[in-house]
Design a protein with these regions (language model features):
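Active-site-proximal beta-strand/loop segments in catalytic clefts of secreted hydrolases
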Residues: 2-5, 45-50, 80-85, 111-118, ...
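Conserved, mostly hydrophobic/aromatic
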Residues: 35, 70, 111, 200, ...
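Glycan-recognition surfaces
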Residues: 62-65, 93, 103-210
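Catalytic cores of secreted or luminal carbohydrate-active enzymes
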Residues: 193-260
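C-terminal beta-strand-rich structural cap/linker in extracellular carbohydrate-active enzymes
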Residues: 325-350
Length: 350
């Protein structure tokens, strides 16, 4: 995806966007053709405002013209930002404008709404024709940013689903502090937590690192078949809280506009039903201390009470280690600070 700053500062005499000839001397169609020959999709950027976030021409009042231009250039994906938008036109109408323009441009272009969750995006975004919607501000390549976004997402579990996915933002996995969003980078364990959480939420997975420099460890992580399976599961069920106390396992409280679950020490336990009857289980330690007793959950919290005569058999998606429930409980492995573990559980006879 080519983000902001790709165009000239003025449109041409016909009101069309013009690619900067110094940055793209052969034009955007040439770039698209090159990318398509590599077997990849080509994404571009525009904005619902009067100018983009960096002050370049945006698509407000030019939606149909710009959609036609993107189609002519062979664009497959449009990131549509929200900077400097008209205060006289509500957000849902701004995104409907581009949504209907793309629907009539003659090319199948995935519409990625990037309104950062502002103006109650979650309430109206499915009306606009958008295929995905950004629910937070921009991510940065540091643990503090990843953790903040994870905690904030607990507010939006009900609003994800097929047709209009909650886009938690691009992946910073493997950036290692490089790039304009680099703020020191993360450890491998923090990157694992980041990637695993995105997969539990079925977020679009878009690598933000330079794939020409990707290291073996990062490549192994982002191609983990079980994690990808969880992210791409055909049901796209939303995750839900699980825990060791049924009366508290689904409670949420709001603090500074961020939802926190009731687990002590910042440990979050999530489950997600999969298409084949199995269950993804995620154990996320957002704290600075090691998990202890709070890594246990009742099988009843995923709909399998002990009275059913069934047990859960969990398999760690990285190590392959198996854990069998006992007495209606599952005790998972302890995970260290900022670490996580993900399992796929199947229901078996007791």
């Amino acid at each position: 995806v080519i983000d902001d700053c790709w165009s000239l500062h003025e449109r041409d005499k016909n009101g069309r966007l013009v690619a900067d000839p110094e940055k793209f001397p052969h034009g955007m169609r040439y770039v698209a053709d090159y990318i398509h020959k590599k077997g990849l999709k080509f994404g571009m950027y525009s904005c619902a405002g009067v100018v983009t976030c960096a002050g370049y021409p945006a698509s407000y009042e030019h939606e149909f013209t710009d959609a036609a231009t993107f189609a002519e250039w062979g664009v497959d994906f449009l990131k549509y930002d929200y900077c400097f938008h008209s205060t006289g036109t509500p957000g849902h109408l701004l995104y409907k404008r581009m949504g209907i323009a793309l629907a009539n441009c003659g090319r199948d272009i995935l519409f990625s709404a990037c309104s950062w969750g502002a103006d109650d995006t979650r309430v109206w975004i499915k009306e606009t024709g958008a295929n995905s919607w950004r629910s937070t501000g921009d991510i940065f390549d540091c643990w503090a940013s990843v953790k903040d976004i994870i905690q904030y997402q607990l507010k939006y579990m009900e609003y994800n689903g097929m047709g209009c996915f909650n886009d938690i933002d691009m992946l910073v996995v493997g950036m290692n502090g490089d790039g304009h969003v680099g703020q020191g980078g993360c450890t491998y364990d923090e990157y694992f937590t980041h990637f695993a959480f995105w997969c539990m939420f079925s977020s679009p997975l878009m690598l933000g690192n330079d794939i020409r420099k990707i290291d073996d460890k990062t490549l192994k992580l982002v191609t983990n078949k079980d994690l990808i399976r969880i992210d791409q599961d055909k049901k796209y069920c939303q995750p839900f809280f699980i825990g060791h106390k049924m009366e508290k396992n689904i409670e949420r409280s709001i603090k500074n506009d961020v939802y926190y679950c009731n687990y002590p020490d910042g440990v979050v336990l999530l489950a997600k039903f999969l298409d084949d009857g199995k269950i993804a289980i995620g154990e996320f330690n957002l704290s600075d201390g090691e998990t202890r007793w709070n890594n246990t959950f009742l099988t009843e919290s995923v709909g399998v009470p002990e009275s059913s005569g069934k047990k859960l058999l969990l398999k760690n998606v990285v190590t392959g280690k198996q854990i069998l429930s006992a007495n209606g409980c599952v005790t998972m492995e302890n995970v260290g600070p900022h670490c996580s573990a993900v399992y796929i559980a199947e229901v078996v006879d007791a």
